[in-house]
Amino acid sequence: MDIFRLDILRHGETELSHTLRGSTDDALTAKGWQHMQQTIETELSLYGVSSQPLWDVIVSSELQRCRLFAFELSEKLMLPLQVNPQFQEMHFGDWEAVDTQQIYAQSPELLTQFWEKPTQFAPPNAETMQQFQQRVVFGLDSLIQQAQEHQWQRVLLISHGGVIKLLKCLALQQPLDDILKMSAELGQLNSFIIHSSNKIRLMEQNK
């Protein structure tokens, strides 16, 4: 049995989009903000006019590239907002806010290993892929529990590419080493159906 639909909006372009910014708290560019706004407006227009809101609640990563947009949207739509650090992007350690070309110039072998086998190789002083998975799944389990308690039908989560890619791996039952092969475009929505058995299913249009 389905519990609720989870729409995840990835933040738009940021000031450091050319780098690995995981826990780095950089701001959206004007283009990035507008991209997110257009995506939400498109989704609302597809839903049409109704006395009921499209979402029951908005949940956001605590990083400003998600949180500030989420706050403004919650005010506009008059929806409750929760800020949950469990849905923050992966922490890249010494590679935080560093251009990938610079990383490749300094540590080509480690970067290649990380791209190919992220469960076995992590950036120096970074969160491991297993730690990242554990954190995000913990956040999802908490969200599922709240959805059951409050009978939420549809939740909007404003989060990051890594979170979306991880949930796609889980939904498609792909190995975690495939996470970097998954798509998660800036400023775009990806939708999942959460089942009562805590299973997650990716909606067809997002495959």
Model-derived features: positions:
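Conserved histidine-centered catalytic loops in small-molecule metabolism enzymes
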Residues: 2, 50-86, 112, 193-207
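Short, hydrophobic/glycine-enriched beta-strand segments
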Residues: 5-11, 157-158
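Short beta-strand scaffold positions
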Residues: 60-61, 134, 158-159
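Active-site-adjacent alpha-helix immediately C-terminal to a catalytic or transition-state-stabilizing loop
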Residues: 67, 138-203
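Phosphate-handling substructures
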Residues: 75-137
